[in-house]
């Protein structure tokens, strides 16, 4: 089964990291990603730009409304994600606890819906 591992942490903390800490964390992410690729469980993943670059889109009464930034202000922001293949939730959690930002933020583990798309 595929699981989305959604990485939440404080953008403020990311921005205030010392350069050495930032580089060390980047290397941790590269090692983690290489490991899950080598194990054949990596399906996709991306880092996201800061919430200041986001636009939220809604349609109300047929009118398209856009707002700069995320829809909800929270202490932790979605900073990236991985999609991995795991046999069950326990294995997905075992993978999630190795993501570097789990030590300062949180990782939401969510099963991906399996939908057969028509050809």
How should each PLM-predicted stretch be described?
Residues 1-119:
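Conserved, structured core segments of small domains
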């Amino acid at each position: 089964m595929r699981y989305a591992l959604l990485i939440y942490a404080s953008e403020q903390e990311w921005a205030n990291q010392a350069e050495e800490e930032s580089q060390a964390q980047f290397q941790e992410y590269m090692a983690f990603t290489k490991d899950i690729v080598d194990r054949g469980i990596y399906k996709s993943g991306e880092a996201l730009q800061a919430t200041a670059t986001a636009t939220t889109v809604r349609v109300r009464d047929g009118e398209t409304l856009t707002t700069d930034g995320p829809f909800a202000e929270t202490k932790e922001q979605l900073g990236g994600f991985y999609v991995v293949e795991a046999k069950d939730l326990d294995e997905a959690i075992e993978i999630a606890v190795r993501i570097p930002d789990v030590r300062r933020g949180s990782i939401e583990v969510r099963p991906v819906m399996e939908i057969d798309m028509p050809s």
